[in-house]
């Protein structure tokens, strides 16, 4: 049985005695972003209804205790459970309550099963006429544009006011988000039109009389609630808060008038008719006091999440035939970097490459929108062999720009002893010229439309990880696989390609030391000391080394573990993509300073829902009669194509040496 969801507005009230209650509208007759309409009058339910956290059925946080169908929707009252015993349940309940109270979670969503529905003319949406209500959830980002928390209040505020105790602060969350501008206008009393400007003393008297009137109105509101034995409802609370704010403004204004009265008494001067008219105009201009408050969203996201959210906005815009930039503004209001990155994806403005003809070489790498792309690249780098160079004490590869000639000396000249009057011999120096051209590595990651539309943070993580995984495997395999040869204009050769491997001598600790000595000897024979040497090996090989023990039961190679470490004083990088065959694995020693790396630091992203794909990591090119294609449109899938410009090359042949058939530690 399919469970549907609909979203609506929520008003939260907090009790000082820890009795957590939420009131709000669980369903409205307005269409959501999916263009569906859920008719409140068609609801079938039985109280109490489970109240869940983010639609997770294994994370209940309370019950719906009251539900009333009205013209505006289904008005609900929700009781959040509270426990005293420490544990995961208490942590979840406290987190849910604090998230709702602080405004981080601002929407309600109903889970239901459709019994009767019809197509809405001129729309892809459905109108659910009869439906069975299963659960209600608090959600972070609702699909309905109206589904936001309107206010967060404490009922204890009214209880304290009734007892004459100073009230606690009120936290308000604006419907547009944390970064929206909220303007509160308080009108102060002024003389009636047609009357002459009153003196300062008359103004003070009038304001004091107005204050008494408003204080009496506040007292009447509280008296009425006390006689009925009830707390203030939403309308009474708003009226009470407004009166309280106006009295505070009047008190400040009276204080200013009294200060002005003292100054006038000390500096009394004749006032002309023109000056009086000007003063009247100035006072009228100050009748309204406006205060604007803007809070900028400074939430620190996990690496790569900002880029994933920009990609999701691009996909949602395509799926729903809406402006992707507008979706980014509505979902992530205040997060300017995500909005700017979405705009960059929509306009297909590629991240500029570094070239020698560009006077502002580093300019394209600065800015909010490009920082999102760089953030994703920085998330991807530590997951690749290439990206681990230059981090955590590991030497860096030699970074070079694209299309710039690299001149290297391959052999030196000779000097000669020359006798008196004899001809001086000539000598010859050998040089080579290399240029790294930008080559593109690309792959396609596929996600379901349900994941794209999911508003939970975990959905953003799924998109980010799929985009990263699309590039990580190819980069690692082609960088280290000895069999990978260069394809002109397409891909670079592996740094081990064309270098003869050294067969491993055995499995024991002594054999390991002999193998290591053989690798070092290869560098010594070429007069190229591996001062920036780095070991590359599979994680299983590193694990086998860490498990080897000497006769005393101590670790034979204590500096290494399955995640890396050091071996004979040099750092170790492990990867699951380093070649491993039945005969054994490959272990390489790489002199990092002898490897050229060109990396512009950018990534290009495109998406489609109509393409047909070969769900294969080695697609036919061109396709044949036996090629099986999968339609993204037919299966509700979204394809993301990610591309990076990158290239590498050995500086010299002696930059690397490697072992083959390694089975260290095997029985």
UniProtKB/Swiss-Prot annotation:
GO terms for cellular component: T=7 icosahedral viral capsid; viral capsid. The keyword Magnesium does not apply. The prohead protease may be autocatalytically cleaved giving rise to the mature capsid protein. The keyword Hydrolase applies. This is Capsid polyprotein. Residues 8-154 are annotated as: Prohead protease activity. GO terms for molecular function: peptidase activity. It comes from Pseudomonas phage PAJU2. Signal peptide: none annotated. GO terms for biological process: proteolysis; viral procapsid maturation. It is an enzyme of class 3 (hydrolase). InterPro entries: Peptidase_S78_dom, Phage_capsid, Phage_capsid-like_C.
